[in-house]
A protein has these predicted regions:
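Ubiquitin-like/PB1-type beta-grasp interaction modules and other compact soluble beta-rich domains
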Residues: 1-80
Length: 81
């Protein structure tokens, strides 16, 4: 299956492209996607530990199954004071 990944600003700086198309096996989860991204672009691996995956405006967990054609946004948490 194919999923599209949109990297938020903090992640986009670490990657060659802010929008990616990734091929995964049927039944793959958000965690499987993170593993593939870390394998393809090792510089993303540390940031992926704290990233917030969002599908259709809703935060999802790493065990969330993905569907063919789905688009995810990966956002870094914001902190401040």
């Amino acid at each position: 299956m194919t999923v599209r990944v949109r990297l938020g600003a903090g992640l986009a700086r670490l990657s060659a492209a802010p929008l990616k198309t990734v091929q995964l096996a049927e039944g793959a989860t958000v965690g499987d996607l993170f593993a593939r991204l870390a394998e393809d672009e090792p510089e993303l691996a540390p940031a992926l530990r704290s990233v917030l995956p969002v599908v259709a405006g809703e935060h999802v967990t790493r065990d969330q199954p993905l569907a063919d054609g789905q688009e995810l946004a990966l956002l870094l948490p914001v902190s401040g004071g």
